[in-house]
């Protein structure tokens, strides 16, 4: 199932707004300044703060702690809050330059507190530049803008509401089908399957339905599993067809 970049981005932002803890965030690859400006329009429409996390931040900048400079100036220990305590979403302006200590603390916080969505930018221009894998694993969505002209990138952004969205019902058979699909794609971790199941349930709700249908599963897999795929299922089937059959 293929969907265009604009719709994919719109759906990703809708799902992140509904349940940040289930989906973590989104990665934009190859975004130009013009692309970034379009993305920032979401925050202008929604009146949501975007807190920037820079690669030179310390762990204390993230989580808070003693401010050494102000403590020296005032003569007593001064504590300050970290950026993660602020309301709003978060932006990692350059994932590739983020030191491992900062990556580890950010992923730890994502696993242990209800963190707002993270918008990450993968600006790696060389083949040897790799975005932090542990952080990428926790961000459900990935949008590749490398081949998308800035004047063709116009997602339908929307204001965020505080109303709670319920999840549509999903059957055990549908859950099993998601897990099987993930395995066929060569994905052996449970997190992407969990994200896909949640996405299917919320996509059904957004379509005013109380139960998940196959089209929800297909769309959720396209949004979350496709860019993680290590194996293309069609290739597996072709390989199996080429194998000589055993004689009885």
Regions found by a protein language model. Give the residues of each.
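Conserved ASCE/P-loop NTPase catalytic core
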Residues: 1-149
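C-terminal engagement/docking regions of AAA+ P-loop ATPases
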Residues: 209-248
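AAA+ ATPase "lid" subdomain C-terminal helix
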Residues: 183-190, 197-212, 223-231
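Amphipathic alpha-helical interaction segments
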Residues: 177, 194-199, 216-219
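N-terminal charge/polar-biased segments
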Residues: 1-4, 155-160, 239-248
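Conserved C-terminal "switch" segment of AAA+ ATPases
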Residues: 140-180, 184-193, 209-210
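Conserved phosphate/pyrophosphate-binding and hydrolysis machinery centered on Walker-type P-loop NTPases
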Residues: 2-6, 29-33, 52, 167-172, ...
């Amino acid at each position: 199932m293929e969907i265009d970049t604009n719709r994919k981005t719109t759906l990703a932002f809708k799902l992140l707004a509904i349940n940040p803890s289930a989906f973590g965030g989104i990665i934009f690859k190859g975004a130009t300044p013009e692309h970034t400006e379009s993305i920032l329009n979401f925050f202008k429409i929604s009146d949501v703060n975007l807190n920037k996390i820079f690669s030179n931040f310390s762990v204390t900048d993230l989580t808070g702690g003693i401010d050494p400079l102000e403590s020296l100036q005032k003569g007593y220990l001064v504590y300050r809050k970290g950026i993660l305590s602020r309301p709003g979403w978060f932006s990692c302006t350059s994932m590739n330059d983020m030191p491992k200590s900062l990556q580890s603390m950010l992923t730890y916080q994502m696993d242990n507190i209800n963190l707002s969505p993270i918008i990450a930018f993968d600006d790696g221009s060389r083949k040897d530049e790799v975005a932090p894998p542990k952080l990428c694993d926790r961000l459900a969505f990935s949008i590749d803008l490398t081949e998308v002209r800035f004047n063709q990138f116009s997602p339908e952004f929307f204001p965020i509401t505080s109303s709670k969205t319920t999840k549509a019902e999903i059957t055990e058979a549908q859950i099993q089908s998601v897990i099987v699909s993930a395995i066929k794609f060569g994905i052996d971790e449970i997190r992407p399957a969990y994200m896909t199941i949640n996405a299917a349930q919320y996509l059904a709700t957004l379509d005013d339905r109380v139960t998940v249908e196959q089209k929800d599963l297909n769309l959720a897999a396209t949004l979350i599993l496709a860019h993680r795929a290590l194996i293309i299922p069609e290739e597996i089937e072709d390989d199996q067809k080429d194998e000589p059959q055993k004689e009885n």
